[in-house]
């Protein structure tokens, strides 16, 4: 707790109210920290970075493919022992969903499946270039506060169910297209975990799984935060 009796760390803030990325690391940061590595983007202690960030705001499956090629060039090539972490697809699902009802649910489901396969091909490309990969599938977008709001706003169909359908199609093709033989790629089944949490939140220590945690736009983090 801070001197004013408030605890800022739960919001990712230090005692002075400044954003501190170390308090709530992204999962990629946590993986890197497990090996004693830091990213330049979250390096308030000025340690020499040995982990490198190629993620981009709003990236889709197509964007990840471009990021893979950029990482190959900027790193001078992947080497044995290099590990890449990948989580993408939510932006694809939202973009595809927003085409409804102009395009049919069946057509959009097929498109979501193709995007999942596209992301898988980008992951397989990482393996081809020499990296090992940990990839997470997409947590069910149909369980998000956004989905629940969309369901309340529209009466043409269950919009949350449609978002779940798109998520499932994406994840299924991702899972069957990646080179999943136990040697090169580890698949994090985040979707199953999030569905279990939504089904029985109390069992996982959650009280509220329907409302957004952030009611205002998040701050843009600087390299030192």
Stretches with model-predicted labels:
Residues 1-225:
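Conserved active-site regions of diverse hydrolases
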